[in-house]
């Protein structure tokens, strides 16, 4: 079976078992700052397992795209050199949220693997592990499924602590956890290795193909395991691994999917399609890089973008080792799209963008290699001994993207070695940081957990009645909040919008007889709206009825900005291109902020075009239409999804100007585009590599902004004794007059310097046949001193000159040496000494150098160094 056929068979099997087929989530985890990348099928269901979110289904199946670059699971440096390490892989999974448990999960796995209709693997080739004390799973496998005891292995705590086992999974130090059962395929005695749990288990004979995790406990901070009221199931089977089994090969790189990518990689590089590890690196890395870019990641020097940059550069380096000339990596994207584009349509949609990003980064890396070589040369020049320190190798690798193997090659050419142990210590420290960042980073038992959902009334108005279903103080559920206490109120229904999609939460108040709760902010936990605030009067109790009143003026101003954000997004794609993707936003009552992908600053004419397009849509005054539909129908209509946002099966589609703007959005908006009134961009700039930011105002705030600009124009006109009509002419004349005066001043300075030069030349002293002049001239800048040094060199002949002075509280220094002395005396060396004396730095050419410092009190001492410098140098 081909990889694509296995993927489809798996999803179809579980659909027939009542599971909902759920699309792969983005590689950028939605609303989860604790994860760098999606690295498991369960990531998108994390809140379901935590009990913070309820979905319309209790059974799900997915083929999840995953990235593991670094850390304990998949060391980047191993990719290409082992049979099963990858930066990108697909995880097939089936999930139960409080529905079926161990029995069904085990039977489903066995049926899919061994059933004649499905994978039809020989049963005698399958081994199974269970957690040592999980008798329930063991009995299901042996007594119901029929796996013989000799192919069953109990795995205990093998990692030095209770429940620290290959067969016990935990979300963190506290929270949901439980035993797991793993299924292994036996490749046969001709392959070295032993069964799981044996000393030879790391061999290639027995390969894990499926893991079933049974979340049945909640571990509290004291280490006690409490049974969960609704146990869940999380499973994972690597598509590449099971494909290798079914295609009778021992390396993932031999499966159909990789064979095509290896061929395309060899053609792009211009090398033989053989078993070279470097070729496997390129074929693997094109997958992770392309999918990351398709999901909105761009190369940068931090976070996710930094990981992407490292993977791209590693691929380029390995391509260069194989003889690649020029850019090649981006040429492989087409082969990947042909291989995986049907299963992941985002690859097809983003192909041109992916190719452009990769080519740009390849070109940048060529420059980086050149820079890295210069830095390495500097470090080698200062090296004492024959070993390049590990921290230097790591700095080149980690900070400058300089490949370790290249550093090693250069060291070998110089008969040097690198400190591999020191480098590994630095790498391990980085891995530990990665491991720490990959944990979920939360205490499950301290989270606010609310059963049920709050019905949102805010689309219909800004007020409504509700009943208090829960109260929280300091994160703990309480029955009552007293006057003056801060807390959180949860209602059964509310008009208050909870912060999401970049729109801030509503503010206002909750009121009943003798009671008032001032709502400062509204957020969401699962499906519940949390009203944060303080009891201003009386007290609140669970079960009490209240009137909820949103601050209408703030809500309306926020709606103007949110609707304008949608119009701006559409305009950006018109003006800049379809590669524009939203990277984040902030919408409140004062302004809007919109971050998006783009590679360069926006030109002034483009900014004007954006404003013109948005304001034209505002003037059209079209109706803002909303529709509730399923996610697939919405995407088929071309609705754009918000970056980093999670969507359920049913979504709200917001349309403006017909098909001018169609987006998925749950926020509050105007009724017609004309309600926005006016749109004005206030700033544009870069916030990260490949990410730009526009800030703007609307409505009354836009009018106030323009009125303020008008007042500034009037003030500027008044300063130049003109009017708004002739302001540009007045400013032009003023600038021309200023240039004329500056030119006149330079001429006067030159005359003064010439006169000073005549006076100074007489002060030169002769040392060993050379004239030495050191003088203090306060108030002159570096340019004037340079001109004076040139003049003095011509006057004095064979000479060394050091001039300095104080200007605006800082020291300015210039040194000069005539050409006939530069073989013995260098101006740059003199400058280093003089600048150091005044607490600064300097340098330059052998015949001319500049510097400066901050300690003017030491200037005379610095100038005195000139004579000693000549005495020692001649």
UniProtKB/Swiss-Prot annotation:
GO-annotated molecular function: alanine-tRNA ligase activity; aminoacyl-tRNA deacylase activity; ATP binding; tRNA binding; zinc ion binding
PROSITE patterns membership: AA_TRNA_LIGASE_II_ALA
Location in or out of the cell: Cytoplasm
Residues noted as binding Zn(2+) in the record, renumbered to the chain: 562, 566, 665, 669
GO annotation, cellular component aspect: cytosol
GO biological process terms, semicolon-separated: alanyl-tRNA aminoacylation; negative regulation of DNA-templated transcription
Cofactor note: Binds 1 zinc ion per subunit.
Record's keyword terms, sorted: Aminoacyl-tRNA synthetase, ATP-binding, Cytoplasm, Ligase, Metal-binding, Nucleotide-binding, Protein biosynthesis, RNA-binding, tRNA-binding, Zinc
UniProt family annotation: Belongs to the class-II aminoacyl-tRNA synthetase family.
Domain characteristics, as noted in the entry: Consists of three domains; the N-terminal catalytic domain, the editing domain and the C-terminal C-Ala domain. The editing domain removes incorrectly charged amino acids, while the C-Ala domain, along with tRNA(Ala), serves as a bridge to cooperatively bring together the editing and aminoacylation centers thus stimulating deacylation of misacylated tRNAs.
Protein name: Alanine--tRNA ligase
Gene encoding the protein: alaS
């Amino acid at each position: 079976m081909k990889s694509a056929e296995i993927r489809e068979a798996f999803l179809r099997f579980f659909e027939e078992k009542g599971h909902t087929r759920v699309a792969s989530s983005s590689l950028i985890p939605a609303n989860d700052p604790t994860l760098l990348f999606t690295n498991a099928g369960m990531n998108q269901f994390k809140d379901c397992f935590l009990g913070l979110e309820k979905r319309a289904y209790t059974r799900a199946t997915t083929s999840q795209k995953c990235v593991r670059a670094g850390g304990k699971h998949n060391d980047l440096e191993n990719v290409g050199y082992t049979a099963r390490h990858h930066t990108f892989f697909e995880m097939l999974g089936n999930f139960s949220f409080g529905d079926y448990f161990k029995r069904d999960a085990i039977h489903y796995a066995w049926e899919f693997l061994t059933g004649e209709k499905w994978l039809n693997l020989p049963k005698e080739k399958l081994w199974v592990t269970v957690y040592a004390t999980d008798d329930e799973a063991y009995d299901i496998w042996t007594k119901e499924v029929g796996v013989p005891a000799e192919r069953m292995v109990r795995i205990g705590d093998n990692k030095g602590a209770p429940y620290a086992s290959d067969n016990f999974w935990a979300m963190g130090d506290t929270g949901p956890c439980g035993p797991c059962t793993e299924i292994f395929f036996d490749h046969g005695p001709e392959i070295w290795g032993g069964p799981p749990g044996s000393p030879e288990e790391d061999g290639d004979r027995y390969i894990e193909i499926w893991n079933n995790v049974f979340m049945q406990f909640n571990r509290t901070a004291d280490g006690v395991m409490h049974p969960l009221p609704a146990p869940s199931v999380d499973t994972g089977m690597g598509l590449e691994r099971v494909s290798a089994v079914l295609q009778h090969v021992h390396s993932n790189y031999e499966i159909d999917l990789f064979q095509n990518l290896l061929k395309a990689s060899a053609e792009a590089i211009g090398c033989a399609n053989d078993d070279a590890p470097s070729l496997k690196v390129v074929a693997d890395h094109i997958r992770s890089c392309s999918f990351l870019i398709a999901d909105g990641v761009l190369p940068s020097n931090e976070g996710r973008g930094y990981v992407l940059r490292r993977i791209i550069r590693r691929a380029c380096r390995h391509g260069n080792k194989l003889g690649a000339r020029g850019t090649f990596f981006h040429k492989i994207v087409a082969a990947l799209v042909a291989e995986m584009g049907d299963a992941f349509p985002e690859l097809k949609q983003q192909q041109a963008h992916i190719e452009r990003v990769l080519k740009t980064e390849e070109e940048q890396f060529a420059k980086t290699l050149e820079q890295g070589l210069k830095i390495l040369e500097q470090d080698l020049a200062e090296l004492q001994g024959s070993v390049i320190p590990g921290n230097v190798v790591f700095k080149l690798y980690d900070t400058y993207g300089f490949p370790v193997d290249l550093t090693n090659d250069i060291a070998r050419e110089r008969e040097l070695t690198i400190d591999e142990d020191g480098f590994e210590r630095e790498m391990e420290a980085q891995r530990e940081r990665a491991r720490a960042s990959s944990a979920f980073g939360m205490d499950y038992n301290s989270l606010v957990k609310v059963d049920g959902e709050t019905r949102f009334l805010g689309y219909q108005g800004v007020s409504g009645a509700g009943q208090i279903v829960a109260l929280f103080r300091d994160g703990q559920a309480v029955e009552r909040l007293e006057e003056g206490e801060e807390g959180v109120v949860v209602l059964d229904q509310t008009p208050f919008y909870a912060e999401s999609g970049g729109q801030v939460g509503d503010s206002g108040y909750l009121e009943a007889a003798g009671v008032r709760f001032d709502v400062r902010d509204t957020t969401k936990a699962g499906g519940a709206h949390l009203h944060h605030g303080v009891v201003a009067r009386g007290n609140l109790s669970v079960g009490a009825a209240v009137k909820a009143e949103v601050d209408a003026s703030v809500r309306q101003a926020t709606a103007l900005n949110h609707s304008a954000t949608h119009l701006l997004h559409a305009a950006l794609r018109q003006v800049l291109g379809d590669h524009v993707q939203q990277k984040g936003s902030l919408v409140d009552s004062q302004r809007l902020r919109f971050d998006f992908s783009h590679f360069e600053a926006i030109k002034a004419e483009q900014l004007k075009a954006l404003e013109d397009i948005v304001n034209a849509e505002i003037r059209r005054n079209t109706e803002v239409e909303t529709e509730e539909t399923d996610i697939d129908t919405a995407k088929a209509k071309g609705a754009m999804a918000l970056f980093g946002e999670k969507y359920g099966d049913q979504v709200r589609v917001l349309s403006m100007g017909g098909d001018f703007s169609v987006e998925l959005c749950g926020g509050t908006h105007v009724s017609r585009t004309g309600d926005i009134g006016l749109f004005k961009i206030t700033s544009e700039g870069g916030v990260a590599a490949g990410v730009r930011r526009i800030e703007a105002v609307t409505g009354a705030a836009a009018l106030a902004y323009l009125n303020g600009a008008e007042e500034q124009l009037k003030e500027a006109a008044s300063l130049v004794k003109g009017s708004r009509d002739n302001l540009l002419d007045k400013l032009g004349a003023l600038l021309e007059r200023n240039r004329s005066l500056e030119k006149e001043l330079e001429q006067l300075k030159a005359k003064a310097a010439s006169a000073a030069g005549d006076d100074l030349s007489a002060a030169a002293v002769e040392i060993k046949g050379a004239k030495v002049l050191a003088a203090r001239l306060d108030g002159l800048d570096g340019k004037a001193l340079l001109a004076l040094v040139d003049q003095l060199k011509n006057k004095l002949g064979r000479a060394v000159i050091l001039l300095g002075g104080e200007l605006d509280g800082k020291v300015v220094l210039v040194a000069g040496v005539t050409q006939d002395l530069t073989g013995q005396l260098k101006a740059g060396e003199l400058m280093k000494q003089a600048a150091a004396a005044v607490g600064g730095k300097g340098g330059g050419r052998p015949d001319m150098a500049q510097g400066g410092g901050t300690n003017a009190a030491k200037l005379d001492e610095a100038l005195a160094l000139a004579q000693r410098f000549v005495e020692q140098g001649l």
